[in-house]
Amino acid sequence: MEQSHQNLQSQFFIEHILQILPHRYPMLLVDRIIELQANKKIAAYKNITFNEDVFNGHFPNKPIFPGVLIVEGMAQSGGFLAFTSLWGFDPEIAKTKIVYFMTIDKVKFRIPVTPGDRLEYHLEVLKHKGMIWQVGGTAQVDGKVVAEAELKAMIAERE
C-alpha cells in the first residue's frame, strides 16, 4: 500500500541504513543520512578513505574515487529516499523490495574526489509515480559540486 511518511526522522546512522539498503561492503556507499524530507529531498554522505579497495587500481600513484561510484552513491541515497517516502523506516518491508536503476542522465564530473574527502549527496525528487522515481542533484565536497546527475529508478519485489 502506497502512502506518504511525512513524520520520518531526519537523520539515519549506518545501523539504520543497513536495515533499508541491500548493499554491503564494498558497494555500500552511504555512511549517514543527514537530512530527509519524505517525497522531497535527501542529504547523505560517505567518508572517502585511502583504505577503499578501489584505490589499489584507480590510480595507484594518484588515488581518485571513480565517478561511477559517486553516481552509485547518489543512486543509493535516492533509493533510501524513495523507499522511506513510501513505507517509512520499515526493515521488514525492506527485505521484500529492491530498487533498480532505469536511467542515468545529465551526468557531469567537475572535480576529482580523493582520500580524506567527505562526499555529500544532495538529491531532490523531480517526480514520481507509483514505484517509479526520478531524482536529481549533486555530489559535493566542502560545498563544491564534484558531480551532478539525474537518476530514474523503480522499486520492485525481491525474488
Swiss-Prot record:
The active site is at residue 58. InterPro entries: FabA_FabZ, FabZ, HotDog_dom_sf. This is 3-hydroxyacyl-[acyl-carrier-protein] dehydratase FabZ. Belongs to the thioester dehydratase family. FabZ subfamily. It comes from the Bacteria. Its main location: cytoplasm. One of its GO terms (cellular component) is cytoplasm. Keywords: Cytoplasm, Lipid A biosynthesis, Lipid biosynthesis, Lipid metabolism, Lyase. CDD domains: FabZ (cd01288). It is found in: Cytoplasm. The keyword Cytoplasm applies. Pfam families: FabA. The keyword ATP-binding does not apply. One of its GO terms (molecular function) is (3R)-hydroxyacyl-[acyl-carrier-protein] dehydratase activity. Its EC number is 4.2.1.59. One of its GO terms (biological process) is lipid A biosynthetic process. Coiled coil: none annotated. Involved in unsaturated fatty acids biosynthesis. Catalyzes the dehydration of short chain beta-hydroxyacyl-ACPs and long chain saturated and unsaturated beta-hydroxyacyl-ACPs. The gene is fabZ. It catalyses: a (3R)-hydroxyacyl-[ACP] = a (2E)-enoyl-[ACP] + H2O. It comes from Helicobacter pylori (strain HPAG1). The lineage of its organism: Bacteria, Pseudomonadati, Campylobacterota, Epsilonproteobacteria, Campylobacterales.
